[in-house]
Amino acid sequence: MMALNIYGHQLDSRLLIGSALYPSPEVMKQAILASGSQVVTLSLKRQNPAEQSGQQIWRYIQEVVTEVNGHLLPNTAGCKTAKEAVTLAKMSREIFKTNWLKLEVIGDDYNLQPDPIELLNAAEQLIKDGFKVLPYCTDDLVLCQRLYDLGCQVIMPWASPIGTGKGLMNPYNLETIRLRLPDATLILDAGIGKPSDACLAMEMGYDGILLNSAVALADNPILMAKAFSHALEAGEQAYVAGVMQQRQTAHPSTPTLDTPFWHQNS
Amino acid sequence: MNIAIVGAGLMGRLVALSLLRGDQLRDKKLRQSQSQSVTITLFDKDNKLAHNSAAYAAAGLLTPLGESLHCEPNIVSMGFESLRLWPTLLDSLDEHTIFQQTGAIMVSHEQDKGDYQRFIKHLKNNYPEHALHTLSRAELLKLEPEIGRSFNQGLYLPQEGQIGNRRLLVALRKQLEKENKHTSSGNKLNWLSECQVIGIEGEIKNEINTTDETRTISYLHGGDKQCQRFDLVIDCRGTGATSKNSQRDCAPLSDLRSVRGELFQLFAPDVHISRPVRLMHPRYQLYIAPKQKGFYVVGATEIESDDDSPMTVRSAMELLSAAYSVHPGFAEANIRQHVSQCRPAFSDNQPKITHKGSLIQVNGLFRHGFLIAPVVLRQVLALVNNRINNTNDNLPYSDYLRTEQRQEEMI
């Protein structure tokens, strides 16, 4: 596979993976290794970051990231305002010594839909402060365009709400974003349920996939991580290979010379 | 023989009582012929009420199938075996402790039916030998009339149960004190509470044969630093043995971590639920454990953090709103207590017994302390027996419970 470009860093794997919801840290580690992913997200909102109470699990995740020669991608999950997200982002930069940030600002409790206004506001402040922002957003073209104009080189629209596993709810929107932002690194984030969902997005030309629940909540997370790795590779290769155009008329792959077209009834 | 037990939580108390009774010597004749009495010293940084132990901040659920979606099958097997062992153990105590095995109920709201159906499929595929009954609304109403009002269906797991966790800690304390006064075995217990162990150091006389090895425990008690030598040390410290909480020369377990859990104790005399209820929800894991006379334990969060500060508003809102959605009667309940405590877990969330020479370490019981304690106790006693008699007999639960030689000594 070709390299994935995240703010100038070339990565071998196009899968970005979350570190929550696994049956145990050990299963998480094995699943990350099986996925081949080199970017691991982690949240710190609930771990009392001011006291660094999540040190043990953070250290564990950092060790896995080091093992795969990868990058840690702290996120601001659970934040509802730009102010809250900016504060948490600064804490995470201090703790993890990285200016990469998955920016997440939630606007609705029920479907955990990102708040576009607070998101733009936070992204602007964080970019000025030197962060490399990877914003998690809805599949709204104009919002993605605005984030890109602000300086977000990576944009992460959702496939569907977090943890639903509903797959690509609006392929038209997602394709439009890809066509209209050809130079942005587009990562499809949230809502992926099956490897075929990830493959579909890669076939559309998305640069990568970020997921968590689809692997962590599988009956066998390690095997599912492998399945996603294969699906991404298949989708990426299909995109590069160029998918054939759909047609209305059947076209036999073996020529049937004895069936001229004027023999058709309609 | 001098034996030290470090940590007087659930495991520490169970091991202490068994050693005081001489239970480690499985053969009765051997026990009678054993002339050498045992002096047990029980060290604990807490007072005897054990309010800082993970066992105090638990609900005492004995629900192996209810836990099965979040744990490995060996924990489920140990859970069922422990359900079999608990009654005998409790019968040997003078103080009454609640032990109930009238089943547990799982429910889910209509919008989360997918999780509910997945759980049923999981049980049928992985645990076909255990009984489960899917209940219609009418059947649920009959079994738990006040739960049936809010749910259209439920799952009844008839073999599940619960134990009075806090009463058991008290009962074990009283039993230890009583049997120490009137012991027939000649064994003695010295319980040093509010005592901080600061060193567990080994002294190996013979590198090849470690049976001669002794351990010296250094501790702070009443402001004084003291040292004492033991033939055997059984470490039951729980989160006290993490690298963060335990110094280098105090046998820390490097792979051990703390996982924060929070729960409520509610007084809800208007709520009448007779058996443990779990709510299946995509975001929260909620259980309600009825503890008699109108008391309920509602828990529990699971946060990857070693913070034991008081419960957060977010956790409180999650737990209470989920409880309210199960039974609106909880709206008028009194919050009697909110508890936060850390549970000890290894990176695979499995319990582990490690041993090397004169040190046995029992840890990583995570959220399954009461669920598996009797099995862990038997395994520890078998190890002690091997150590005392210099034998290498098979251990009873090696198929389920990881029991291994400690690889590296930190000291």
Label every PLM stretch briefly.
Chain B
Residues A59-L143:
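Dinucleotide-binding Rossmann-like beta1-alpha1 core, especially the glycine-rich loop
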Residues L14, S18, L61-L62, G66, ...:
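Active-site substrate-recognition segment that forms the wall
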Residues G154-E203, E207, Y219, C236:
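Helical element adjacent to the flavin cofactor pocket in flavoenzyme catalytic cores
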Residues A333-I411:
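C-terminal catalytic lobe of FAD-dependent flavoproteins
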Residues H70, N74-F80, V107-D115, L155-K174, ...:
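Short beta-strand to alpha-helix junction loop
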Residues A4-V6, F43, Q228-G240, L377:
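Short hydrophobic core segments
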Residues L20-A55:
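Glycine-rich FAD pyrophosphate-binding loop
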Residues H96-H109, K121-H122, A131-Q175, T301-S305, ...:
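Helix-loop-beta segment of a Rossmann-like dinucleotide-binding subdomain
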